[in-house]
Protein backbone atom coordinates (compact mmCIF):
# COMPACT_ATOMS: atom_id res chain seq x y z
CA UNK A 1 0.00 0.00 0.00
CA UNK A 2 1.03 3.62 -0.28
CA UNK A 3 3.23 5.05 2.45
CA UNK A 4 3.18 8.61 3.73
CA UNK A 5 4.40 11.21 1.22
CA UNK A 6 4.66 8.63 -1.55
CA UNK A 7 4.45 10.17 -5.00
CA UNK A 8 5.30 7.16 -7.15
CA UNK A 9 3.22 4.14 -8.02
CA UNK A 10 2.61 1.41 -5.48
CA UNK A 11 4.47 -1.89 -5.77
CA UNK A 12 2.82 -4.23 -8.23
CA UNK A 13 0.78 -7.18 -7.01
CA UNK A 14 -0.46 -8.32 -10.41
CA UNK A 15 1.16 -8.79 -13.82
CA UNK A 16 -1.02 -6.04 -15.24
CA UNK A 17 0.31 -3.56 -12.71
CA UNK A 18 3.87 -4.65 -13.49
CA UNK A 19 3.22 -3.83 -17.14
CA UNK A 20 1.64 -0.51 -16.20
CA UNK A 21 4.64 0.47 -14.09
CA UNK A 22 7.03 -0.44 -16.89
CA UNK A 23 4.97 1.58 -19.35
CA UNK A 24 4.88 4.51 -16.94
CA UNK A 25 8.67 4.49 -16.72
CA UNK A 26 8.94 4.18 -20.51
CA UNK A 27 6.64 7.13 -21.17
CA UNK A 28 8.24 9.23 -18.45
CA UNK A 29 11.72 8.73 -19.92
CA UNK A 30 10.45 9.92 -23.29
CA UNK A 31 8.81 12.91 -21.65
CA UNK A 32 12.03 13.84 -19.85
CA UNK A 33 14.00 13.51 -23.07
CA UNK A 34 11.67 15.78 -24.99
CA UNK A 35 11.40 18.34 -22.19
CA UNK A 36 15.15 18.70 -21.79
CA UNK A 37 15.64 18.91 -25.54
CA UNK A 38 13.06 21.66 -25.86
CA UNK A 39 14.29 23.54 -22.80
CA UNK A 40 17.85 23.35 -24.07
CA UNK A 41 16.81 24.71 -27.46
CA UNK A 42 14.82 27.50 -25.81
CA UNK A 43 17.75 28.35 -23.58
CA UNK A 44 20.09 28.58 -26.54
CA UNK A 45 17.77 30.73 -28.62
CA UNK A 46 16.99 33.09 -25.74
CA UNK A 47 20.60 33.61 -24.68
CA UNK A 48 22.09 34.44 -28.08
CA UNK A 49 22.11 37.73 -29.92
CA UNK A 50 22.89 36.15 -33.25
CA UNK A 51 20.51 35.03 -35.97
CA UNK A 52 21.10 31.95 -38.05
CA UNK A 53 19.78 32.50 -41.55
CA UNK A 54 19.88 28.76 -42.21
CA UNK A 55 17.15 28.18 -39.62
CA UNK A 56 14.65 30.59 -41.15
CA UNK A 57 12.28 28.83 -43.54
CA UNK A 58 14.25 25.60 -43.43
CA UNK A 59 12.23 22.90 -45.16
CA UNK A 60 14.50 20.05 -44.05
CA UNK A 61 14.15 21.01 -40.41
CA UNK A 62 10.38 21.30 -40.74
CA UNK A 63 10.28 17.82 -42.21
CA UNK A 64 12.44 16.39 -39.45
CA UNK A 65 10.50 17.86 -36.60
CA UNK A 66 7.20 16.75 -38.11
CA UNK A 67 8.17 13.13 -38.70
CA UNK A 68 10.15 12.67 -35.50
CA UNK A 69 7.21 13.45 -33.14
CA UNK A 70 5.06 11.02 -35.10
CA UNK A 71 7.64 8.29 -34.55
CA UNK A 72 7.82 9.11 -30.85
CA UNK A 73 4.05 8.95 -30.54
CA UNK A 74 4.06 5.54 -32.16
CA UNK A 75 6.72 4.40 -29.71
CA UNK A 76 4.39 5.43 -26.89
CA UNK A 77 1.18 4.17 -28.45
CA UNK A 78 2.20 0.62 -29.32
CA UNK A 79 2.99 -0.58 -25.77
CA UNK A 80 0.01 1.39 -24.51
CA UNK A 81 -2.38 -0.44 -26.83
CA UNK A 82 -0.80 -3.76 -25.91
CA UNK A 83 -1.44 -3.18 -22.21
CA UNK A 84 -4.95 -1.92 -22.93
CA UNK A 85 -5.86 -5.18 -24.61
CA UNK A 86 -4.10 -7.21 -21.94
CA UNK A 87 -6.35 -5.69 -19.29
CA UNK A 88 -9.41 -6.84 -21.22
CA UNK A 89 -8.42 -10.51 -21.25
CA UNK A 90 -10.65 -12.77 -19.20
CA UNK A 91 -8.12 -15.60 -18.87
CA UNK A 92 -10.52 -18.39 -17.90
CA UNK A 93 -11.29 -17.21 -14.36
CA UNK A 94 -11.39 -19.56 -11.38
CA UNK A 95 -13.63 -17.46 -9.16
CA UNK A 96 -16.26 -14.79 -9.70
CA UNK A 97 -16.90 -12.10 -7.11
CA UNK A 98 -19.56 -9.43 -7.40
CA UNK A 99 -18.95 -5.97 -6.01
CA UNK A 100 -21.96 -3.70 -5.70
CA UNK A 101 -21.54 -0.05 -4.81
CA UNK A 102 -23.93 1.74 -2.52
CA UNK A 103 -23.93 5.12 -0.84
CA UNK A 104 -21.60 4.67 0.99
CA UNK A 105 -20.32 1.14 1.25
CA UNK A 106 -19.57 -1.89 -0.88
CA UNK A 107 -21.48 -5.16 -0.95
CA UNK A 108 -19.65 -8.30 -2.01
CA UNK A 109 -21.28 -11.51 -3.22
CA UNK A 110 -19.40 -14.81 -3.33
CA UNK A 111 -22.09 -16.74 -5.15
CA UNK A 112 -19.59 -19.39 -6.28
CA UNK A 113 -18.85 -20.07 -2.63
CA UNK A 114 -22.05 -20.94 -0.89
CA UNK A 115 -23.74 -17.64 -1.55
CA UNK A 116 -21.84 -15.58 0.99
CA UNK A 117 -22.90 -11.93 0.92
CA UNK A 118 -21.62 -9.19 3.16
CA UNK A 119 -21.30 -5.43 3.38
CA UNK A 120 -17.99 -3.68 3.76
CA UNK A 121 -18.14 -0.42 5.70
CA UNK A 122 -15.25 1.82 6.63
CA UNK A 123 -14.29 1.58 10.28
CA UNK A 124 -15.28 4.87 11.93
CA UNK A 125 -12.42 6.62 13.74
CA UNK A 126 -13.89 5.73 17.13
CA UNK A 127 -13.60 2.01 16.33
CA UNK A 128 -9.97 2.05 15.25
CA UNK A 129 -7.49 -0.08 17.17
CA UNK A 130 -3.75 0.61 17.27
CA UNK A 131 -2.35 -0.38 13.90
CA UNK A 132 -5.59 0.21 12.01
CA UNK A 133 -5.52 2.66 9.16
CA UNK A 134 -7.74 5.70 9.31
CA UNK A 135 -10.15 6.01 6.37
CA UNK A 136 -8.87 2.74 4.89
CA UNK A 137 -9.80 -0.18 7.13
CA UNK A 138 -13.17 -1.87 6.87
CA UNK A 139 -15.22 -4.14 9.07
CA UNK A 140 -15.28 -7.03 6.54
CA UNK A 141 -12.43 -7.68 4.17
CA UNK A 142 -12.65 -9.37 0.81
CA UNK A 143 -10.57 -12.55 1.08
CA UNK A 144 -9.29 -14.01 -2.18
CA UNK A 145 -6.67 -16.53 -3.27
CA UNK A 146 -3.42 -15.54 -4.96
CA UNK A 147 -2.20 -16.99 -8.26
CA UNK A 148 -5.75 -17.68 -9.41
CA UNK A 149 -7.51 -15.63 -12.08
CA UNK A 150 -10.40 -13.85 -10.42
CA UNK A 151 -13.26 -12.17 -12.20
CA UNK A 152 -14.84 -9.10 -10.59
CA UNK A 153 -18.35 -8.17 -11.64
CA UNK A 154 -18.81 -4.56 -10.64
CA UNK A 155 -22.05 -2.65 -10.57
CA UNK A 156 -23.87 -0.13 -8.44
CA UNK A 157 -27.24 0.09 -6.84
CA UNK A 158 -27.64 3.86 -6.69
CA UNK A 159 -25.06 6.27 -8.15
CA UNK A 160 -21.77 5.98 -9.98
CA UNK A 161 -18.85 4.54 -8.06
CA UNK A 162 -15.51 3.18 -9.18
CA UNK A 163 -13.88 0.09 -7.73
CA UNK A 164 -10.16 0.81 -7.68
CA UNK A 165 -7.23 -1.07 -6.14
CA UNK A 166 -4.03 0.65 -7.29
CA UNK A 167 -1.60 -2.12 -6.40
CA UNK A 168 -3.48 -4.52 -8.67
CA UNK A 169 -3.79 -2.01 -11.48
CA UNK A 170 -7.57 -2.09 -11.23
CA UNK A 171 -10.04 0.70 -11.69
CA UNK A 172 -13.48 -0.20 -12.99
CA UNK A 173 -16.57 1.97 -12.91
CA UNK A 174 -19.59 0.76 -10.96
CA UNK A 175 -22.52 2.04 -12.99
CA UNK A 176 -26.13 1.35 -11.99
CA UNK A 177 -27.81 -0.91 -14.51
CA UNK A 178 -24.51 -1.98 -16.05
CA UNK A 179 -22.40 -4.97 -15.09
CA UNK A 180 -18.72 -4.29 -15.71
CA UNK A 181 -16.24 -7.13 -15.73
CA UNK A 182 -12.57 -7.05 -14.88
CA UNK A 183 -10.08 -9.78 -14.08
CA UNK A 184 -6.86 -9.91 -12.15
CA UNK A 185 -4.35 -12.41 -10.83
CA UNK A 186 -2.51 -11.56 -7.64
CA UNK A 187 1.11 -12.68 -7.40
CA UNK A 188 1.81 -12.23 -3.70
CA UNK A 189 -0.18 -12.47 -0.48
CA UNK A 190 -1.01 -9.49 1.70
CA UNK A 191 -3.61 -6.89 2.50
CA UNK A 192 -4.21 -4.33 -0.23
CA UNK A 193 -6.25 -1.16 -0.08
CA UNK A 194 -8.31 0.78 -2.55
CA UNK A 195 -10.92 3.48 -2.50
CA UNK A 196 -13.99 4.55 -4.40
CA UNK A 197 -12.65 6.56 -7.33
CA UNK A 198 -15.76 8.24 -8.72
CA UNK A 199 -17.36 11.13 -6.84
CA UNK A 200 -20.50 9.61 -5.36
CA UNK A 201 -21.69 12.05 -2.74
CA UNK A 202 -20.79 13.46 0.64
CA UNK A 203 -19.07 10.31 1.91
CA UNK A 204 -17.22 9.43 -1.28
CA UNK A 205 -13.96 9.46 0.66
CA UNK A 206 -15.28 7.01 3.25
CA UNK A 207 -15.94 3.83 1.30
CA UNK A 208 -12.60 2.01 1.11
CA UNK A 209 -11.86 -1.39 -0.39
CA UNK A 210 -9.70 -3.93 1.40
CA UNK A 211 -8.54 -7.13 -0.28
CA UNK A 212 -6.86 -9.83 1.76
CA UNK A 213 -5.01 -12.12 -0.62
CA UNK A 214 -3.95 -15.47 0.81
CA UNK A 215 -2.46 -18.65 -0.66
CA UNK A 216 -4.95 -20.94 -2.35
CA UNK A 217 -4.45 -23.82 0.10
CA UNK A 218 -5.38 -21.60 3.02
CA UNK A 219 -8.28 -20.12 1.08
CA UNK A 220 -9.61 -23.63 0.41
CA UNK A 221 -9.63 -24.33 4.14
CA UNK A 222 -12.50 -21.89 4.29
CA UNK A 223 -11.46 -18.90 6.40
CA UNK A 224 -13.68 -16.82 4.16
CA UNK A 225 -16.64 -18.37 5.95
CA UNK A 226 -15.42 -17.23 9.33
CA UNK A 227 -15.66 -13.54 8.50
CA UNK B 1 -46.18 -20.39 -14.31
CA UNK B 2 -42.90 -22.10 -13.64
CA UNK B 3 -41.63 -22.32 -10.11
CA UNK B 4 -38.99 -19.62 -9.99
CA UNK B 5 -37.72 -20.63 -6.57
CA UNK B 6 -34.89 -22.58 -8.11
CA UNK B 7 -33.21 -25.02 -5.80
CA UNK B 8 -29.58 -24.60 -4.95
CA UNK B 9 -27.63 -26.87 -7.30
CA UNK B 10 -25.76 -29.76 -5.70
CA UNK B 11 -22.13 -29.34 -4.77
CA UNK B 12 -19.94 -30.55 -7.57
CA UNK B 13 -17.06 -29.77 -9.85
CA UNK B 14 -18.37 -26.30 -10.59
CA UNK B 15 -15.80 -23.57 -10.66
CA UNK B 16 -17.15 -20.42 -12.23
CA UNK B 17 -18.66 -19.47 -15.59
CA UNK B 18 -16.05 -19.77 -18.32
CA UNK B 19 -15.32 -17.03 -20.81
CA UNK B 20 -18.23 -16.74 -23.22
CA UNK B 21 -17.11 -15.48 -26.65
CA UNK B 22 -20.63 -14.25 -27.34
CA UNK B 23 -20.05 -11.53 -24.74
CA UNK B 24 -16.43 -10.40 -25.05
CA UNK B 25 -16.93 -6.81 -23.92
CA UNK B 26 -16.45 -5.39 -20.45
CA UNK B 27 -20.20 -4.93 -20.07
CA UNK B 28 -21.56 -8.33 -19.06
CA UNK B 29 -25.16 -7.37 -18.53
CA UNK B 30 -26.24 -9.22 -21.67
CA UNK B 31 -24.37 -12.31 -20.50
CA UNK B 32 -26.18 -12.23 -17.17
CA UNK B 33 -29.59 -11.59 -18.71
CA UNK B 34 -29.20 -14.11 -21.53
CA UNK B 35 -28.35 -16.92 -19.14
CA UNK B 36 -31.27 -16.00 -16.93
CA UNK B 37 -33.59 -16.20 -19.94
CA UNK B 38 -31.95 -19.42 -21.15
CA UNK B 39 -32.51 -21.01 -17.77
CA UNK B 40 -36.20 -20.26 -17.70
CA UNK B 41 -36.67 -21.20 -21.34
CA UNK B 42 -34.91 -24.48 -20.64
CA UNK B 43 -37.13 -25.16 -17.64
CA UNK B 44 -40.24 -24.35 -19.65
CA UNK B 45 -39.27 -26.51 -22.61
CA UNK B 46 -38.16 -29.56 -20.66
CA UNK B 47 -41.10 -29.35 -18.28
CA UNK B 48 -43.49 -29.26 -21.20
CA UNK B 49 -41.83 -32.37 -22.65
CA UNK B 50 -41.83 -34.14 -19.31
CA UNK B 51 -38.05 -34.46 -19.26
CA UNK B 52 -35.58 -33.94 -16.47
CA UNK B 53 -34.59 -30.34 -15.88
CA UNK B 54 -31.11 -31.28 -14.68
CA UNK B 55 -29.43 -29.96 -17.88
CA UNK B 56 -30.88 -26.53 -17.07
CA UNK B 57 -28.64 -26.45 -14.04
CA UNK B 58 -25.78 -25.04 -16.12
CA UNK B 59 -27.71 -21.89 -16.99
CA UNK B 60 -28.69 -21.48 -13.37
CA UNK B 61 -25.09 -21.69 -12.24
CA UNK B 62 -23.96 -19.17 -14.82
CA UNK B 63 -26.54 -16.53 -14.11
CA UNK B 64 -26.28 -17.14 -10.37
CA UNK B 65 -22.55 -16.40 -10.59
CA UNK B 66 -22.79 -13.40 -12.89
CA UNK B 67 -25.99 -11.58 -11.89
CA UNK B 68 -26.27 -9.48 -8.74
CA UNK B 69 -28.70 -11.16 -6.38
CA UNK B 70 -30.91 -8.10 -6.12
CA UNK B 71 -31.38 -8.15 -9.88
CA UNK B 72 -32.35 -11.81 -9.86
CA UNK B 73 -34.81 -11.29 -7.01
CA UNK B 74 -36.37 -8.42 -8.90
CA UNK B 75 -36.72 -10.47 -12.08
CA UNK B 76 -38.12 -13.44 -10.18
CA UNK B 77 -40.68 -11.17 -8.56
CA UNK B 78 -41.69 -9.89 -11.98
CA UNK B 79 -42.05 -13.43 -13.28
CA UNK B 80 -44.28 -14.33 -10.35
CA UNK B 81 -46.46 -11.32 -11.03
CA UNK B 82 -46.53 -12.01 -14.74
CA UNK B 83 -44.97 -8.68 -15.69
CA UNK B 84 -41.53 -9.86 -16.73
CA UNK B 85 -40.52 -8.05 -19.91
CA UNK B 86 -38.29 -10.77 -21.32
CA UNK B 87 -39.68 -13.45 -23.58
CA UNK B 88 -39.48 -16.85 -21.90
Curated annotation (Swiss-Prot), chain A:
Enzyme class: translocase
Domain of life: Eukaryota
Binding site for Cu cation A2: 196, 198, 200, 204
Residue ranges, Mitochondrial matrix side: 46-59
EC numbers: 7.1.1.9
GO molecular function, one term: cytochrome-c oxidase activity
InterPro entries registered for this protein in UniProt: CcO_II, CcO_II-like_C, CcO_II_C, Copper_CuA, Cupredoxin, Cyt_c_oxidase_su2, Cyt_c_oxidase_su2_TM_dom, Cyt_c_oxidase_su2_TM_sf
One cellular component term from this protein's GO annotations in UniProt: membrane
Comment on bound cofactor: Binds a dinuclear copper A center per subunit.
UniProt: Cu cation A1 binding residues: 161, 196, 200, 207
Keywords tagged on the record: Copper, Disease variant, Electron transport, Magnesium, Membrane, Metal-binding, Mitochondrion, Mitochondrion inner membrane, Primary mitochondrial disease, Respiratory chain, Translocase, Transmembrane, Transmembrane helix, Transport
Transmembrane segment boundaries: 15-45, 60-87
Reactions catalysed according to its record: 4 Fe(II)-[cytochrome c] + O2 + 8 H(+)(in) = 4 Fe(III)-[cytochrome c] + 2 H2O + 4 H(+)(out)
Mitochondrial intermembrane side: 1-14, 88-227
Subcellular location: Mitochondrion inner membrane
GO biological process: ATP synthesis coupled electron transport; cellular respiration; lactation; mitochondrial electron transport, cytochrome c to oxygen; response to hypoxia
Cofactor list: Cu cation
Binding, Mg(2+): 198
Membrane topology, from the record: Multi-pass membrane protein
Stated role: Component of the cytochrome c oxidase, the last enzyme in the mitochondrial electron transport chain which drives oxidative phosphorylation. The respiratory chain contains 3 multisubunit complexes succinate dehydrogenase (complex II, CII), ubiquinol-cytochrome c oxidoreductase (cytochrome b-c1 complex, complex III, CIII) and cytochrome c oxidase (complex IV, CIV), that cooperate to transfer electrons derived from NADH and succinate to molecular oxygen, creating an electrochemical gradient over the inner membrane that drives transmembrane transport and the ATP synthase.
Sequence similarity: Belongs to the cytochrome c oxidase subunit 2 family.
Assembly and oligomerization: Component of the cytochrome c oxidase (complex IV, CIV), a multisubunit enzyme composed of 14 subunits. The complex is composed of a catalytic core of 3 subunits MT-CO1, MT-CO2 and MT-CO3, encoded in the mitochondrial DNA, and 11 supernumerary subunits COX4I1 (or COX4I2), COX5A, COX5B, COX6A1 (or COX6A2), COX6B1 (or COX6B2), COX6C, COX7A2 (or COX7A1), COX7B, COX7C, COX8A and NDUFA4, which are encoded in the nuclear genome.
Disease: Mitochondrial complex IV deficiency: A disorder of the mitochondrial respiratory chain with heterogeneous clinical manifestations, ranging from isolated myopathy to severe multisystem disease affecting several tissues and organs. Features include hypertrophic cardiomyopathy, hepatomegaly and liver dysfunction, hypotonia, muscle weakness, exercise intolerance, developmental delay, delayed motor development and intellectual disability. Some affected individuals manifest a fatal hypertrophic cardiomyopathy resulting in neonatal death. A subset of patients manifest Leigh syndrome.
Native source organism of the sequence: Homo sapiens
Gene: MT-CO2
UniProtKB/Swiss-Prot annotation, chain B:
An individual GO BP term: oxidative phosphorylation
Keyword DNA-binding: no
Key words of the record: Disulfide bond, Membrane, Mitochondrion, Mitochondrion inner membrane
Disulphide connectivity of cysteines: 32-67, 42-56
InterPro entries attached to this UniProt entry: COX6B-like (IPR048280), CX6/COA6-like_sf (IPR036549), Cyt_c_oxidase_su6B (IPR003213)
This protein's pathway: Energy metabolism; oxidative phosphorylation
Motif extent (Cx9C motif): 32-42
Membrane topology listed for this record: Peripheral membrane protein
Keyword Disulfide bond in annotation: yes
Region (Disordered): 1-22
GO terms for cellular component: mitochondrial crista; mitochondrial inner membrane; mitochondrion; respiratory chain complex IV
Localization per record: Mitochondrion inner membrane
Subunit structure: Component of the cytochrome c oxidase (complex IV, CIV), a multisubunit enzyme composed of 14 subunits. The complex is composed of a catalytic core of 3 subunits MT-CO1, MT-CO2 and MT-CO3, encoded in the mitochondrial DNA, and 11 supernumerary subunits COX4I1 (or COX4I2), COX5A, COX5B, COX6A1 (or COX6A2), COX6B1 (or COX6B2), COX6C, COX7A2 (or COX7A1), COX7B, COX7C, COX8A and NDUFA4, which are encoded in the nuclear genome.
Family the UniProt entry places it in: Belongs to the cytochrome c oxidase subunit 6B family.
Name of the protein this chain belongs to: Cytochrome c oxidase subunit 6B2
Organism placement in taxonomy: Eukaryota, Metazoa, Chordata, Craniata, Vertebrata
Gene transcribed to yield this protein: COX6B2
Amino acid sequence: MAHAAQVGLQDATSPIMEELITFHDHALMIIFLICFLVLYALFLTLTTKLTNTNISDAQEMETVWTILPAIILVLIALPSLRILYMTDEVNDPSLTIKSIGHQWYWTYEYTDYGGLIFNSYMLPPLFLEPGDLRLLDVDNRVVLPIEAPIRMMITSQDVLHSWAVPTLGLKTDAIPGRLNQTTFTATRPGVYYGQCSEICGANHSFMPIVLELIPLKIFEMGPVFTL
Amino acid sequence: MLDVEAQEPPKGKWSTPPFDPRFPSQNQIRNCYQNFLDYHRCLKTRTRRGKSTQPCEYYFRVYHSLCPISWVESWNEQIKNGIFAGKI
